[in-house]
Amino acid sequence: MRTIRRTTAAIVVAAGALIAATTVAGAITGGADDDPVDPTHPNVGIVVFYQPDGRFRCSGTLVHPRVVVTAAHCTFGDVGKVAVSFDTEVAPDAAAGRRVIPRALDDLGFGEEGSGFDDGLWIVELDADGNPLPHYPYDNTGFADGTADGSPVWVTGTALTHPDYSDFTDIKNWNDTGVVILDEAITGVATAALPPEGYLDGIPQKALVKELIRTVGYGTEVRQADTGPQAPTPMSFPIRRQLTDEKPQKLTSQILQMNGNERDPFGGGGTCFGDSGGPAFHGGYIVGDTSYGYTSNCRYLGGYQRVDIPVVRSWLVCVLNNAGSGAAAATAACGSLD
């Protein structure tokens, strides 16, 4: 988790570290599990990315067979490939997470250190004979053969960051949107639609605050632990797709702000760590991606990067138009912040 201090508030980035926690908890605060048999949002996936200080998770939305929209703070500074899965449940607990979530995508997942892999985050488990248990293997293309034991299937991709992303330094030019260009197309999953330009501006403010916006992600839930200190804290597991409906509070030129308190009588909760980059849906469109919250225990106001504004939408359209030719072609045509 990265925290950016402001003069008036602490803006907490909603990316989630893949830490080893033993307490079972859900994802989106106050939300509900997506149905694993007949999912409501099968085009929302978990995005696992790698940086010099560790391995983290975000969420994202398939908007093209080879393009996942996520947050720029999830893609900026990534090392090597990104891993994406659209499985409804990824890991029920920390032990499973250590086995089924890829380590670094430039190794085979058996313990060799690679780019973005922080050795301090990993626990080596031993079998009855004292031999190290391997992490879940996958081949060099990045696809895991998850069909045999129900483990998640992963696909690799390359992260691109909006070229005008301000890294939380300019609220008027926030542009917290990134994408993952997948190495192979996803089939059998309906893609989400981008909104018309200025879609949210077309809803009067008085009407907008009466609407419900669906948010989806693979993040943590803030709750009391089953044992030990009872102060509400973010819980990392299980990692699974959850959803909720939030009430908008205000709209700016860049941000849709919503109330993420699950006790709001008009809404159902909000997003938390690991939900970053996940979608905000309205009217059949993805209108935003999860950007930040104001507190370290979530359950308060959240900011969602608008994707209907020209500066973001035009970049996404360019990426979609070039994604079929691969990440290098999309980068050359549309740009990406290094």
Where are these regions (language model features)?
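Short amphipathic beta-strand segments in non-cytosolic proteins
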Residues: I46-V48
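Conserved catalytic-core segment of clan PA serine endopeptidases
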Residues: T29-T40, Y50-P52, V82-G188, G198-L200
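Short, solvent-exposed aromatic-acidic interface loops
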Residues: T75, P163-Y165, G260-P265, S291-T295
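C-terminal subregion of chymotrypsin/trypsin-like serine protease catalytic domains
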Residues: T40-H41, R57, L62-F76, V82-P92, ...
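Chymotrypsin/trypsin-fold serine protease catalytic domain
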Residues: N173-G268, G302, I309-L316
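Short loop/turn motifs at secondary-structure junctions and domain boundaries
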Residues: Y50-D53, R263-D264, G269-C272
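Secretory targeting and sorting signals
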Residues: M1-A27
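C-terminal region of N-terminal signal peptides and the immediate post-cleavage residues
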Residues: I19-P36, K81, A327-D338
